[in-house]
């Protein structure tokens, strides 16, 4: 059904120029060795969609005071955006066949890591970035870059909001970003077999 077509992009090509993490863990995290090809991953995308639907349940329920749910809304929309970006370049570690012909266990992963949306986006291959920007504009009517910059740290800030002193969030912006990325990555997989 969703994301079932296979592309011919070589697996190791995606890791040659991938930016390294900027935090203290950069020396301990290495790119996993993916089996098969890197392409939009339906399993990661479905997780993103679930976080979007959870936020929409709050947003669209009549009589709900959105101010009472600011942080759950932001966290769910921001995690949807993060997972949508990560779904754009997913793959499996492990897998293959045993000598008996049985399928080995595989772990679904993304080429991208972290929670900062700008960093996650920047770690994607340039053709993937361009396709997402184009599909995002088509899906939402908005440019991706300004929303990505504005909402880049929303998940990090809102999940432990009690650690923050003040701050403000653009609820409509993060909602547009989440829905636009969800739609863009889905379109990316169906239009680029």
Model-derived features with residue positions:
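Long, charged low-complexity segments
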Residues: 3-52, 56, 95-193
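Short regulatory "switch" loops immediately downstream of catalytic or recognition motifs
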Residues: 58-61, 90-96
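Helix-loop segments that flank and shape redox-cofactor active sites
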Residues: 56-69
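A structural signal for alpha-helical segments
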Residues: 43, 68-75, 169
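Short, hydrophobic, well-ordered secondary-structure elements
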Residues: 49, 70-92
């Amino acid at each position: 059904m969703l994301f079932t077509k296979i592309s011919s992009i070589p697996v190791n090509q995606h890791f040659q120029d991938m930016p390294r993490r900027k935090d203290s863990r950069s020396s301990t995290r290495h790119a996993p060795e993916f089996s098969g090809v890197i392409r939009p991953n339906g399993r990661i995308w479905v997780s993103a969609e679930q976080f979007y639907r959870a936020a929409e349940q709050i947003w669209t329920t009549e009589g709900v005071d959105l101010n009472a749910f600011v942080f759950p809304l932001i966290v769910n929309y921001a995690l949807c955006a993060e997972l949508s970006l990560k779904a754009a370049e997913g793959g499996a570690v492990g897998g293959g066949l045993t000598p008996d012909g049985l399928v080995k266990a595989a772990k679904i992963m993304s080429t991208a890591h972290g929670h900062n949306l700008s960093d996650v986006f920047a770690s994607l291959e340039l053709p993937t970035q361009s396709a997402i920007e184009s599909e995002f504009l088509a899906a939402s009517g908005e440019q991706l870059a300004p929303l990505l910059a504005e909402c880049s740290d929303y998940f990090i800030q809102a999940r432990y909001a009690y650690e923050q002193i003040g701050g403000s969030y653009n609820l409509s912006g993060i909602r547009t970003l989440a829905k636009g990325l969800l739609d863009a990555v889905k379109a990316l997989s169906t239009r680029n077999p």
